[in-house]
């Protein structure tokens, strides 16, 4: 059995090193940008961070494969042979990086038997790191170096107001159409799928409803962090996400939720909860 506690400090260091590479390019203000086959952008910062993370993880654990967003063309026939693997988004929030909002992060997950067992998220602009590994809780390292245990926000029922993290680029009407109109909602815009899920994990918001394309690398690390903090990441049928089981690496629409005692099956209006966009 792999000792995750021994691996964790090195993985955090790798995420921070990746973040520094990204930050150097971001602050310099000059970078190359291309459009990938899926019509999403990739920058020289994505590629530099990818190179660093893959090289460092391979040095750390030569026997564990690395699957990165920037090198994701490995077929399922090969991937299904992996009992465990690293799943990485070197720069989550590329559009926010390009726009200059600062909402981006490096994400590293260790997946074993189709479920994430370790997750690290590092936000270069704030200097905050989030991490968790199976059975040991979820934690946040502040810019000052203080390590604080985090947990999701628990409501006193009945609740009348729910804080919802949304993408800065999300169609707000598409979100509100899927929420019970009898409740009040505080919509909190933020870039980076990982950082929004981390807001749920630390109790800053109650949920993050994601409609639209994401990859498995966008959710694996935060699924571990959120679950260890007391929450869940579920698809819109309210069943858990899983990893490395399909030809596609694209996620379904999903919700990151903090307090499972809330009636999510009615908060997410039944007619719309089942819809995929």
Question: What residues fall within each predicted segment?
Answer:
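Oxyanion/phosphate-interacting regions
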Residues: 1-13, 19, 178-182, 196-277
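Active-site-adjacent structural elements in enzyme catalytic cores
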Residues: 7, 55, 59, 73-145, ...
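N-terminal subdomain of lithium-sensitive/metallo-dependent phosphomonoesterases centered on the IMPase/IPPase/PAP
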Residues: 1-91, 277
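Residue-level signal for inorganic ion chemistry
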Residues: 18, 22, 46, 57, ...
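Acidic beta-strand-loop-alpha-helix segment within the catalytic core
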Residues: 109-198, 245-277
């Amino acid at each position: 059995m792999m000792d995750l506690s021994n691996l964790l400090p090195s993985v955090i260091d790798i995420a921070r090193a990746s973040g520094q590479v990204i930050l150097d390019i971001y602050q310099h203000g000059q970078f190359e940008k291309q459009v990938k086959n899926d019509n999403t952008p990739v920058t020289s910062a994505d590629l530099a961070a990818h190179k660093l993370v893959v090289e460092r993880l391979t040095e750390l654990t030569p026997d564990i494969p690395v699957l990165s967003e920037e090198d994701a063309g490995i077929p399922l026939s090969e991937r299904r042979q992996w009992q465990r693997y690293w799943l990485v988004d070197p720069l989550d929030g590329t559009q926010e990086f390009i726009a200059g909002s600062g909402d981006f992060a490096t994400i590293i997950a260790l997946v074993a038997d189709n479920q994430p067992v370790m997750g690290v998220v590092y936000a270069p602009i704030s200097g905050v790191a989030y991490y968790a590994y199976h059975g040991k809780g979820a934690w946040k390292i502040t810019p000052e170096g203080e390590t604080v245990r985090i947990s999701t926000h628990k409501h006193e029922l009945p609740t009348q107001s729910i804080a919802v993290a949304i993408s800065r680029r999300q169609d707000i009407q598409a979100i509100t159409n899927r929420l019970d109109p009898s409740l009040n909602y505080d919509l909190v815009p933020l870039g980076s799928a990982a950082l929004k899920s981390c807001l749920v994990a630390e109790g800053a918001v109650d949920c993050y409803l994601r409609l639209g394309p994401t990859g498995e690398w966008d959710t694996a690390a935060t699924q571990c962090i959120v679950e260890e903090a007391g929450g869940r990441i579920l698809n819109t049928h309210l069943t858990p996400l899983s990893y490395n089981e399909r030809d596609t690496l694209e996620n379904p629409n999903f919700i990151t939720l903090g307090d499972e005692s809330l009636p999510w099956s009615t908060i997410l209006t039944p007619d719309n909860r089942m819809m995929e966009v």
